[in-house]
Amino acid sequence: MHGRHVTLKDIVLDLQPPDPVGLHCYEQLVDSSEDEVDEVDGQDSQPLKQHFQIVTCCCGCDSNVRLVVQCTETDIREVQQLLLGTLDIVCPICAPKT
């Protein structure tokens, strides 16, 4: 630009089209979906095991007996039903006596 005021002849535009860029990807993808096992699906097929603490009374001396088990929520419900039914827990002191 020359002078104080802008004129159209002072503006130079380079109006050449840009170089074309190939946007195609020519890679071949191998279908390996049959070979792979999805880790998330593998974890869903096995229920999550957790630690559960069971505090109950000895059937012989009524002292507190504490157990820690590792199982699923479904299994701990079954243990609960057994404890409410016929299953009795015996402490180490009373175990030799029975």
Curated annotation (Swiss-Prot):
GO molecular function, one term: DNA-binding transcription factor activity
Main location: host cell
Motif (LXCXE motif): 23-27
Sequence motif Nuclear export signal, residues: 76-84
Gene3D superfamilies, per the entry: 3.30.160.330
Entry comment, domain topic: The E7 terminal domain is an intrinsically disordered domain, whose flexibility and conformational transitions confer target adaptability to the oncoprotein. It allows adaptation to a variety of protein targets and exposes the PEST degradation sequence that regulates its turnover in the cell.
Subunit structure, as described in the record: Homodimer. Homooligomer. Interacts with host RB1; this interaction induces dissociation of RB1-E2F1 complex thereby disrupting RB1 activity. Interacts with host EP300; this interaction represses EP300 transcriptional activity. Interacts with protein E2; this interaction inhibits E7 oncogenic activity. Interacts with host TMEM173/STING; this interaction impairs the ability of TMEM173/STING to sense cytosolic DNA and promote the production of type I interferon (IFN-alpha and IFN-beta).
Homology family: Belongs to the papillomaviridae E7 protein family.
Functional note: Plays a role in viral genome replication by driving entry of quiescent cells into the cell cycle. Stimulation of progression from G1 to S phase allows the virus to efficiently use the cellular DNA replicating machinery to achieve viral genome replication. E7 protein has both transforming and trans-activating activities. Induces the disassembly of the E2F1 transcription factor from RB1, with subsequent transcriptional activation of E2F1-regulated S-phase genes. Interferes with host histone deacetylation mediated by HDAC1 and HDAC2, leading to transcription activation.
UniProt name for this protein: Protein E7
Organism, scientific name: Human papillomavirus type 6a
